[in-house]
Design a protein with these regions (language model features):
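Bacterial N-terminal signal peptides that target proteins for export
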Residues: 7-27
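C-terminal segment of classical bacterial N-terminal signal peptides
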Residues: 31-40
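Short, surface-exposed loop and linker segments with low hydrophobicity and enrichment for Pro/Ser/Thr
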Residues: 42-51, 103-116, 149-168
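N-terminal secretory signal peptides
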Residues: 44-103
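Non-cytosolic coordination micro-motifs
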Residues: 55-58, 63, 122-180
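Long, charged/polar, surface-exposed segments that mediate recognition or autoinhibition
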Residues: 90-148
């Protein structure tokens, strides 16, 4: 009995260390892409842009729409539109995972979910490949259709957005933790 408990505890520690390793790797690998970023609009993105926004898009961070609205407002100025339950910010010249980000969106108060998303100048397959190469996170296709969604184990989704890709992480505002 004690051996089984020890094995489960050891396995849990291994999973935690693996997650911590992936986050550290993501931070290290996203940082080189920051050197080529050009700021647009009112200000340049903070040096932490690739880490903060990248990890949120990968569903590796908690989502807080107020925090990300303020962060994006500071980096890019006023949103250029409010549509579909989201504030849209122009982010031309920004790069994450070696891919150009054209727009970033964060939910407004009308949305039933907290989410952050980005429109990427590239195909969903190219974005999926870039993320896998940069941080080791893999996406699986929901089905074999041409416009199939791709989803990571953490819940991040890559979809078609006209001729570009859109990546997002969404969490319901109404989910509450279960009893332990």
């Amino acid at each position: 009995m004690a051996s089984t408990h020890h094995q489960r505890r050891h396995a849990h520690q291994g999973v935690c260390l693996n997650i911590i390793h992936r986050i550290a790797l993501a931070c290290a690998l996203l940082a080189p892409g920051l050197a080529g970023m050009n700021g647009v609009a009112n200000a340049a993105p903070a040096a932490t842009f690739g880490i903060e926004v990248g990890n949120a898009l990968l569903c590796l961070n908690q989502l807080n729409s107020k925090y990300f609205y303020d962060y994006l407002f500071e980096a890019f100025g006023k949103p250029y539109k409010t549509e579909g339950g989201a504030y849209w910010f122009k982010a031309a010249g920004s790069n994450i995972w070696g891919m150009e980000i054209t727009d970033i969106l964060v939910n407004d108060s009308s949305s039933p979910a907290d989410f952050i998303g980005a429109v990427v100048n590239g195909t969903p397959q190219a974005l999926s490949d870039a993320i896998t190469k940069s941080v080791g996170i893999r996406y699986t296709l929901d089905d074999a259709g041409k416009y199939s969604l791709r989803q990571s184990q953490a819940g991040s989704v890559i979809a078609y957005a006209d001729t570009k890709a859109k990546i997002y992480c969404a969490k319901s505002k109404y989910l509450v933790p279960g009893k332990q």
